[in-house]
């Protein structure tokens, strides 16, 4: 007799959420992920433990982590933007080696830090092409929460890339989110998703992954490998890590009400301008069925 689960296999999320055999059980889950993160170190902040509990993770960086404006770079950065980008690249390779991710599974899409939304069409095409080649079971990325304009761009890239694949009749991976940071009650909140009443999904759909002592040590070592980012990374705790299915976002509306975290930092991008660019891109995408 054929098992009902063979005819209707559980979704990747249901497999991850299974309390006995899922990602919180400590057993490695036979699902292949691609992580799309905005900058080198984002993958360690949000999903270092997840990477170790899944099969053959591939990590894709949306940008090189090097802003054009020297004032937006790490105090430890010296020299040209290209030199800083190389430093960020080398730190990522060293950090991910600690998680067993080999260099052929570490990819850069070529965006510039702080400017991903301006390159959104090209970045989405590149990522869709990668997904078609790799055919992962899941993609893990940032949530749309106004923490960093490049984080929000990563969420948009994943959403559009899946639609590109669907138009071409190709398989689309399930999309999950990890935590990063956002503004709440006047403070930067890390390690949590935006509350449900802000339209960001249900807390009942979240998985809180408690890291083992060994995983905590490895995460600390990975964070330490990002020598240039130590001032920023000091605000992040070691665990737990959280995952949830990505909601269907309206990228033309503000993620949370009020001011966004990156707006409070007086960066060049504003939420209003980001959404204006996103709306124009999405309108063009809808008008061009061949995209």
PLM feature segments, named:
Residues 62, 98-111:
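A conserved beta-strand->alpha-helix junction
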Residues 84-99, 157-161:
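Short, solvent-exposed amphipathic alpha-helices that sit
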Residues 65-67, 114, 183:
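Active-site loop signature of alpha/beta-hydrolase-fold enzymes
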Residues 1-34, 79, 103, 116-291:
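Metal-dependent de-N-acetylase/amidase catalytic core
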Residues 22, 26-83:
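ATP-dependent adenylation/pyrophosphate-handling site
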């Amino acid at each position: 007799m054929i098992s009902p689960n063979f005819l209707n296999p559980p979704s990747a999320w249901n497999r991850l959420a299974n309390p006995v055999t899922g990602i919180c059980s400590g057993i490695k889950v036979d699902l292949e992920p691609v992580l799309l993160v905005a900058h080198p170190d984002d993958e360690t902040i949000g999903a270092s433990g997840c990477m170790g509990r899944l099969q053959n993770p591939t990590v894709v960086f949306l940008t090189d982590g090097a802003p054009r404006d020297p004032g937006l770079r790490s105090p430890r950065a010296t020299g040209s933007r290209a030199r800083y980008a190389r430093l960020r690249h080398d730190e990522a390779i060293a950090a991910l080696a600690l998680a067993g991710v080999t260099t052929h599974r570490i990819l850069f899409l070529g965006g510039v830090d702080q400017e991903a939304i301006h390159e959104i069409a090209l970045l989405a095409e590149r990522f869709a092409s990668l997904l078609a080649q790799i055919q992962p079971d899941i993609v893990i990325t940032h949530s749309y929460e106004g923490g960093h304009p490049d984080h929000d761009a990563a969420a948009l890239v994943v959403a559009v890339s899946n639609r590109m694949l669907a138009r071409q009749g190709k398989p689309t991976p399930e999309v999950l989110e990890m935590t990063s940071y956002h503004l709440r009650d006047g403070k930067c909140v890390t390690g949590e998703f935006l509350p449900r009443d802000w339209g960001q999904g249900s807390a009942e759909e979240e998985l809180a992954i408690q890291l083992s002592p060994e995983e905590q040590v490895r995460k600390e070592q990975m964070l330490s490998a990002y020598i240039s980012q130590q001032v920023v990374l000091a605000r992040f705790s070691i665990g737990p890590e959280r995952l949830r299915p990505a909601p269907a976002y309206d990228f033309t509306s503000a993620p949370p009400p009020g001011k966004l975290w990156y707006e409070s930092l007086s960066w060049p991008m504003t939420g209003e301008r980001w959404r204006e660019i996103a709306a124009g891109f999405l309108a063009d995408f809808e008008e061009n069925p061949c995209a």
